[in-house]
């Protein structure tokens, strides 16, 4: 039977994958994807702990995190499209020469 520790180990591994993606990538789209992976690892942990304690609060919070993450991605990708139209690049290095 799959227990709580299995889910928490999975959530930890997914979290580490997201952290490595954030630290290693210079592309802004990949940074967005990596941050979504981090949020999904938190959702896995919340849902697993919620199921373990027979409480729906964690699953409800995970549902709201998914909804907020979807709106975050929509706004973030819109900003990235505008940035690409302005600079022609979506590299993290292209953001260092912003002028106010």
UniProtKB/Swiss-Prot annotation:
TM spans (from-to): 2-22, 29-49, 60-80
EC number: 7.1.1.-
A biological-process GO annotation: ATP synthesis coupled electron transport
Any single GO CC term annotated in Swiss-Prot or TrEMBL for this entry: plasma membrane
GO molecular function: NADH:ubiquinone reductase (non-electrogenic) activity; quinone binding
Family affiliation: Belongs to the complex I subunit 4L family.
Oligomeric and partner information: NDH-1 is composed of 14 different subunits. Subunits NuoA, H, J, K, L, M, N constitute the membrane sector of the complex.
Known role: NDH-1 shuttles electrons from NADH, via FMN and iron-sulfur (Fe-S) centers, to quinones in the respiratory chain. The immediate electron acceptor for the enzyme in this species is believed to be ubiquinone. Couples the redox reaction to proton translocation (for every two electrons transferred, four hydrogen ions are translocated across the cytoplasmic membrane), and thus conserves the redox energy in a proton gradient.
Protein name: NADH-quinone oxidoreductase subunit K
Species annotation: Campylobacter concisus (strain 13826)
Gene that encodes the chain: nuoK
């Amino acid at each position: 039977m799959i227990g709580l520790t299995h889910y928490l180990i999975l959530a930890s591994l997914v979290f580490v994958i997201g952290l490595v993606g954030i630290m290693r990538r210079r592309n802004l789209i990949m940074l967005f994807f990596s941050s979504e992976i981090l949020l999904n690892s938190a959702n896995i942990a919340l849902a697993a702990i919620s199921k373990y304690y027979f409480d729906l609060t964690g699953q409800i919070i995970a549902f709201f995190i998914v909804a907020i993450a979807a709106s975050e991605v929509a706004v973030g990708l819109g900003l990235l499209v505008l940035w690409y139209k302005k600079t022609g690049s979506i590299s993290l290095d292209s953001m260092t020469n912003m002028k106010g």
